[in-house]
């Protein structure tokens, strides 16, 4: 599972950077991120599971049981891949329809975000300027101490650490002060965004278009279920031989073990 966790963590980190609030490039759509995450997670689980199965079959117990789990796992993986290929166009159509139906709401929220961005930008620039000034002051204070360390070598290391400690604490305290000021400055805009979002959602709920959207969403889900049903049934049929083979191998292993015990 470590590989799965690492894969998911990498996806979230890169995704959060790609959708940074202040970036200028067009961000990836939410639906594309959902699809990419699902695909990456399934692939990670499948690959990690295969590694565990391979390790078990290579063990002494796995060789003794001879369940042929790896062959069954590969067959299962092929069936799942086939299902994904069959459902690909169906799910794509569903996401496209849903994205189209909610386009107006995203446009309104983007307008609100752009307005807030322009208003808070001066505060962010001021915060960045003050922080750079603090770092520069810290650097100027530390630089003579670094020179002193190079000249005095090890005997002055402890003395240098004692001198650096209050400087680091001073930088930390100043940073906290600037962050608190920035948080206070941005709080009204954060509250305003929450109020606007609540207003948008309330207006959406009370509007006639909400019932229409709900009907469209229900229709899209119904269509998705109908189109996915044959593919899921095919997957079930494809898994039957795998399950039967696994059952037969397991029963055979138990029978062999019983014979060995009775012959002793």
UniProtKB/Swiss-Prot annotation:
Presence of keyword Repeat: yes
Subcellular locations according to the entry: Secreted
PTM text: Glycosylated.
Molecular-function annotations in GO: cholesterol transfer activity; phosphatidylcholine-sterol O-acyltransferase activator activity; phospholipid binding; protein homodimerization activity
UniProt KW keywords: Cholesterol metabolism, Glycoprotein, HDL, Lipid metabolism, Lipid transport, Lipoprotein, Oxidation, Palmitate, Phosphoprotein, Repeat, Secreted, Signal, Steroid metabolism, Sterol metabolism, Transport
Signal peptide bounds: 1-18
Positions carrying Methionine sulfoxide: 109, 193
Listed GO biological process terms: acylglycerol homeostasis; cholesterol efflux; cholesterol metabolic process; lipoprotein metabolic process; phospholipid efflux
SUPFAM superfamilies, sorted: Apolipoprotein A-I (SSF58113)
Gene Ontology CC annotations of this record: chylomicron; extracellular vesicle; high-density lipoprotein particle; low-density lipoprotein particle; very-low-density lipoprotein particle
Predominant subcellular localization, coarse grouping: secreted
First and last residues of every Sequence repeat: 67-88, 89-110, 111-121, 122-143, 144-165, 166-187, 188-207, 208-229, 230-240, 241-264
Annotated region described as 10 X approximate tandem repeats, given as residue ranges: 67-264
Domain of life: Eukaryota
Claim: Signal is one of the keywords in the record: yes
Sequence similarity: Belongs to the apolipoprotein A1/A4/E family.
Function: Participates in the reverse transport of cholesterol from tissues to the liver for excretion by promoting cholesterol efflux from tissues and by acting as a cofactor for the lecithin cholesterol acyltransferase (LCAT). As part of the SPAP complex, activates spermatozoa motility.
Assembly, per entry: Homodimer. Interacts with APOA1BP and CLU. Component of a sperm activating protein complex (SPAP), consisting of APOA1, an immunoglobulin heavy chain, an immunoglobulin light chain and albumin. Interacts with NDRG1. Interacts with SCGB3A2. Interacts with NAXE and YJEFN3.
Protein name: Apolipoprotein A-I
């Amino acid at each position: 599972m470590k590989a799965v966790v690492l894969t998911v963590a990498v996806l979230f980190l890169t995704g959060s950077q790609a959708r940074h609030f202040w970036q200028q490039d067009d961000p990836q759509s939410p639906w594309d991120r959902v699809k990419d995450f699902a695909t990456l997670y399934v692939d990670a689980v499948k690959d990690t599971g295969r590694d565990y199965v391979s390790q078990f079959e290579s063990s002494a117990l796995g060789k003794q049981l001879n369940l042929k789990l790896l062959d069954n796992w590969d067959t299962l993986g092929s069936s799942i891949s086939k299902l994904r290929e069959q459902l690909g166009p169906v799910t794509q159509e569903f996401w496209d329809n849903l994205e189209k139906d909610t386009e107006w709401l995203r446009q309104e929220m983007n307008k609100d975000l752009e307005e807030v961005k322009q208003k808070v930008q001066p505060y962010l620039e001021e915060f960045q300027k003050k922080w750079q000034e603090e770092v520069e002051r810290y650097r100027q204070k530390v630089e003579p101490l670094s020179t002193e360390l190079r000249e005095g070598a090890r005997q002055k290391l402890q003395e240098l650490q004692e001198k650096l400690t209050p400087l680091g604490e001073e930088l930390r305290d100043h940073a906290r002060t600037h962050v608190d000021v920035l948080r206070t400055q941005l709080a009204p805009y954060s509250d305003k965004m929450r109020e606007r979002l609540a207003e948008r959602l309330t207006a959406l709920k009370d509007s006639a278009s909400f019932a229409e959207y709900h009907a469209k969403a229900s229709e899209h889900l119904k269509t998705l279920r109908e189109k996915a049903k044959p593919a899921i049934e095919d997957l079930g049929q494809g898994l039957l031989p795998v399950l039967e083979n696994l059952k037969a191998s397991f029963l055979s292993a138990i029978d062999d073990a019983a014979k060995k015990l009775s012959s002793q």
